[in-house]
């Protein structure tokens, strides 16, 4: 790892203390040194890096804006352009395998947007959209993620009902030429369970999804030939003694492909599950404190460590993760930054 890019919320409406998109250089001893804090628009809340590792793209939560940046030799960012896609509250962003288009999920917009990339890395026009219908005309189901399968041929997009729509996850085939998405399957969740995020296993056959209000993690088998999903298992993301909402937030498969982790915002905890190497089924291993408040996001770095962004305690906590036992052990490395909600590494 050379650099870390941290998206931080900035608005009073979000009770935020962040100041923008923060760039850190990761030093040889593992410490993080801030190099830049860039404010373009409010709430740079989620970001991704293109396939050539030359450009970074960021969505601005609660707004309708998406920004592009060139990554300089020293890791700092140069703003290229910001476009208005029209869909409110973009919450996730990713680049296709050909580096041709950018996909954005919008929550209140209920729509996935495909945006063309210009030759200079800036964002071009919206070339395709896919909207999740709601219960009535003019209403939508709120889309919360745009996750690729391992081969970047399909997008998995969780959506929530939030009264006017339907909680669900869809498998969508991506056409690289047109940028269009076409549905191949959908999973309809129980009312109020509210699917949030999913994570694909390295074998491209096992998919794990967390539900925000149901406080569950679900296991699916995925058939890439047909694009079909088969739901096989669900487990709680909190111990049986927890009776209140926990608000499951993020789900990841660890780099070894042996474990699934889920963060819980209201109990400030991390759930860890072991993956059966033959079947893909999960077995609960344990629950660990995240040592902060509201772990909205976490991710693994190339060094195998797990980094948890605690939004409401303004910290990123580094954990050593044991791929043999599944234990999360905090290191002494704590990064202080206002309202962190996304971390992206550049090696």
Write out the residue ranges for each language-model feature:
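Asp-box/WD-like beta-propeller blade repeats and closely related beta-sheet repeat scaffolds
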Residues: 77-149
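Short coil/turn segments that connect the beta-strands within blades of beta-propeller domains
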Residues: 1-2, 52-54, 98-100, 151-153, ...
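Conserved beta-strand positions in repeat-built beta-propeller and related beta-rich domains
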Residues: 6-9, 14-15, 58-62, 104-108, ...
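Short loop/turn segments immediately following beta-strands, especially the blade-tip
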Residues: 24-30, 69-75, 114-124, 171-180, ...
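A short beta-strand motif characteristic of beta-propeller blades
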Residues: 33-39, 78-84, 127-136, 182-189, ...
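Beta-rich catalytic cores
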Residues: 17, 43-45, 89, 142, ...
């Amino acid at each position: 790892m050379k650099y870390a890019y941290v998206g931080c919320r900035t608005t009073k409406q979000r009770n935020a203390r962040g100041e923008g998109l923060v760039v850190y250089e990761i030093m040889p001893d593992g410490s993080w040194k801030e190099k830049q804090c860039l404010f373009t628009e409010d709430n740079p809340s989620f970001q991704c890096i293109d396939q050539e590792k030359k450009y970074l793209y960021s969505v601005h939560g609660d707004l309708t804006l998406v920004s592009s940046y060139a990554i300089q030799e020293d890791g700092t960012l140069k703003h290229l352009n910001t476009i208005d896609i029209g869909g409110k509250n973009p919450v996730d962003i990713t680049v296709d395998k050909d580096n041709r288009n950018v996909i954005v999920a919008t929550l209140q917009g209920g729509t996935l947007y495909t945006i063309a990339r210009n030759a200079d890395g800036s964002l071009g026009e919206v070339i395709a959209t896919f909207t999740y219908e709601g219960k009535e005309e003019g209403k939508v189901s709120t889309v919360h993620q745009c996750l690729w399968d391992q081969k970047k041929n399909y997008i998995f997009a969780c959506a929530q009902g939030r009264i006017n729509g339907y909680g669900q996850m869809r498998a969508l085939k991506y056409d690289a030429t047109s940028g269009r998405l076409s549905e191949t399957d959908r999973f309809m969740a129980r009312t109020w369970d509210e699917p949030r995020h999913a994570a694909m296993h390295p074998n491209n056959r096992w998919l794990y999804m967390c539900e925000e209000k149901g406080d569950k993690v679900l296991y699916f088998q995925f058939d890439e030939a047909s694009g079909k999903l088969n739901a096989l298992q669900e487990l709680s993301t909190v111990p049986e003694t927890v009776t209140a909402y926990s608000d499951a937030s993020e789900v990841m498969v660890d780099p070894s492909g042996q474990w699934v982790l889920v963060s819980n915002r209201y109990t400030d905890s991390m759930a860890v599950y072991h993956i059966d190497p033959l079947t893909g089924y999960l077995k609960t291993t344990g629950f660990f404190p995240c040592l902060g408040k509201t772990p909205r996001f976490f991710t693994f770095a190339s060094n195998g460590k797990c980094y948890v962004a605690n939004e409401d305690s303004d910290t990123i906590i580094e954990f050593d993760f044991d791929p043999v036992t599944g234990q999360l052990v905090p290191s002494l490395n704590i990064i202080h930054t206002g309202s962190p909600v996304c971390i992206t590494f550049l090696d």
